[in-house]
């Protein structure tokens, strides 16, 4: 098993990013309150943004001293993406995603301020068959590596990548590249869902991820706080073992 354990000065508790995949702000706030100090970093995505009052949620999270990752995968003409990123950076958000060509990624990076820009490589819900259906002639690893190299070249801070491809990134690209890995699933009782390229907490970090994003395994647990605490304990154990 590879060991590309991150040596970036990131507080261990911040390495777990909880995905607030919920239908409205009220439910999101209820879950945040329930999780308490078990989670310090939250991801807000399309579902919550479409529900309304999402910027009020972002401000509320920041007021509670939480870190915020806005995952909207900006993909529009470069001018529009640049302006959107600039507006978002004023909210004190920590990370945001972009999913486009070099010009789009460069516009985001140029207007980021203190915001960390993460380029999406290949969604964890896609596999090799899906790429073929989309017209790609390369394999998943080749596409992830190509997109990561281009993102770094135009000024992005990091990428979003399945933990399966992170060892390749660590072996081929500057170790300072920030890598956030979604698609985290438990070893046992792994649910059947739309995630196709998944890893465990331990695998993600040993493969070189700096952060992991966990949603359903915590959100849908009988006791979400206990599930989050268990994930945090796993992360502490990985870094303590080195």
From Swiss-Prot:
The keyword Aminoacyl-tRNA synthetase does not apply. Pathway: Pyrimidine metabolism; UMP biosynthesis via de novo pathway; UMP from orotate: step 2/2. It holds the Pfam family OMPdecase. GO terms for molecular function: orotidine-5'-phosphate decarboxylase activity. Its EC number is 4.1.1.23. GO terms for cellular component: cytosol. Keywords: Decarboxylase, Lyase, Pyrimidine biosynthesis. Belongs to the OMP decarboxylase family. Type 1 subfamily. Catalyzes the decarboxylation of orotidine 5'-monophosphate (OMP) to uridine 5'-monophosphate (UMP). This is Orotidine 5'-phosphate decarboxylase. It comes from Methylococcus capsulatus (strain ATCC 33009 / NCIMB 11132 / Bath).
